[in-house]
Amino acid sequence: MFPRFCALLISCAAAFGQTHVSKSPANRLVHLDDPSPFYPHRDFPKLITPQWVGEDGVEAVVTLGIDDMNSAARYENFLRPILERLKKIDGRAPVSILTCRIAPDDPQVQVWLKEGLTIEVHTLNHPCPLLHQGRFDLAANVVHGGMDLLSQIKGNVPVAYRMPCCDSMNSLSPRFFAEIFNKVSDGGRFMKIDTSVFNITTAKDKSLPREWVVDKDGNPRFNKYLPRKPKPGLRTMESYMGTIEDYPYPFVINRLCWEFPCTVPSDWEAQNLIGNQNPQMLEDWKRALDVTVKKKGTMNLVFHPHGWASTQQLVDLVDYADKTYGKKVKFLNFRECADRLEKHLLQGGSLRDAKGGDAGVRVLDLNADGFMDVVIPAKKLTRVWDAKAGKWTESPLPFDPRGLSAGVLDKSNAASFHDPTGTVWTYRDKIWLKTAVTPASDRTGQLRDVDNDGIAEWLGKRIHKWDPANRRWITTPNVVPGAVHLNDPAIRFVDLNEDGFDDILFSDKTRWGIYLWEQRVNAGLGWRPGWSYVVAEGLREDPGALPMISRGGEHPNNGAWIHSNHIWWQNEYTANLPDVVDRRSFKQLLDFGGPKPKSPADSQKAFRVRDGFEVRLVASEPQVKDPVAFAWGTDGKLWVAEMGDYPSGINGKPGGVVRWLVDADGNGHYEKSTVFLEGLNFPNGVLAWGKGVLISATPDIIYAEDTTGDGRADVRKVLFTGFNQGNQQHR
């Protein structure tokens, strides 16, 4: 079967941001079902430090995470001055060492643990990328094996993970979180924190002083460390997509993982741009700390003992934090972060149950005030943050959110949980209100506002609209892609054509398709409300098939995510591709299967004429552009009208052109081109006349002439006017 294609003309704008942000406020809770680690954005509800740290006066947390350890001596030498400076603050030395291998009985490790350090997981052998060689089992084994090894250290329980090379390549993947992090090791162990996503502070955050986000040379202070343009000796980061922007807060990935986003730059990113131990790196780290304190977030610093940063620079950063902010800044190791989240935020609960499964905790903004709240089924507790008072308010939680879908079913923007068997729980006026409802015909689905009316629909095999008056779901006639269940893990919802409505990318082990949401009705084109515009669809074996989003089987998540107007894939089969990822831009997706431009020679060959006739090529780009009419003059000049301004003008102004061409060597090909007249309003006709030319450019018929001999018109007269403009194609 060959893929089915529909032609589509579209203009794609520049990248509109890091991640896809749904237009409808009713979709503010879809992150709970999003497997991507890159969904937070600048305006996403935040979990500020006072909400979870459990210590009065502390406004920001700093973690110091040093990577790559496989022997103790080198790390002791590098860290010792840093540890001693930390001890001067409160007697502790809270540093986390992201470790590959270490002897569990190494005596140095016990010294560190007593001082306040923790030993965390960095895989057994540091593969870059982790997913490679077409061997998922290799990746899982080096992660879980590292966790089991470090658990043999007396007094050490590893809780955190950092992905090797996460600061220099696309080694991080949704496949890792869904199929490795969220599982348990052979020893039944699991982790609680990842710290591999990088947060870029940008000048788009208008709450920050300009000097914090722009350096003395006028460059973006933090974006510059991810260079986009190739330069000798510099690794370009043009396709590096392991980032979020302006969100220095912990967040939850795929329900079971706390993400502590890393600060840009790491010491590797700094040396890549400005060399080893450059003073500018320390200056920018200090500004990152300033930002963290102002935003009441976390600064998670990535560094190594490889000479990219010096010990003294780390000591100076600690010294700056202590002297500038005092007790407002708290240094913690990752075990302390996990403990404080569970004690002070979750009241003794956890994202994961004793066996590593989903404990039902949901971190979400219940009242749409911009701050995260929590529901904790093990404690039957709802906790809502009172930002003005700076404290939590609590109320009972009368249901278990596991198996339920969250969304907005009320114009008040209140959060609801929907039980597809016949109950809706809505949080309003600080309590949960229970509503018995008539279930939809589809019992499996998710809540998502697809028509942007501010109320979520129930998406299953069909689209079901909420009827609040009768407390029921009504099946709509909106078009759904054939044989596609809208809760399928092989679907990604994203606005491909920037019309404000979510479109569908679908790809599983047998089928794939690209479907645009359509509001218009056009029976001839097959357009009906819903996902009726089929850009392309086909079978897995089709040439050019969209890579799988879900591959089925035991480990289905295939590592797809949306970022910067692209869909990306990172898995064990992409490691040999450029930047270790597969990718499709939105422009490519919308042009899927469309005809590609032909060379002038190939275009000539494509013509078919009757016997006795032939087609000769006399002019092509770049001598002409967007030609719509031509005529010869008695002097042999070829006059051409160009409508490059169709259909909306150029920057809103007329941009049509008339030019003349000459065949200087008499070979039949017009190689010299001169612009005669510009700024015409959609010209569609030209005729040599007298000493000049006649041009039809509605509403006018114009006579233009060159009287100076420079080849350009200096006389322009309107001979007739008043012609109806209408559609340029219908003149």
Predicted segments — roles?
Residues 579-731:
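Beta-propeller domains with acidic blade repeats across secreted/periplasmic ectodomains
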Residues 359-366, 405-418, 443-450, 489-496, ...:
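Beta-propeller blade termini
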Residues 36-39, 44-47, 54, 88-90, ...:
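C-terminal domain-boundary segment and adjacent tail
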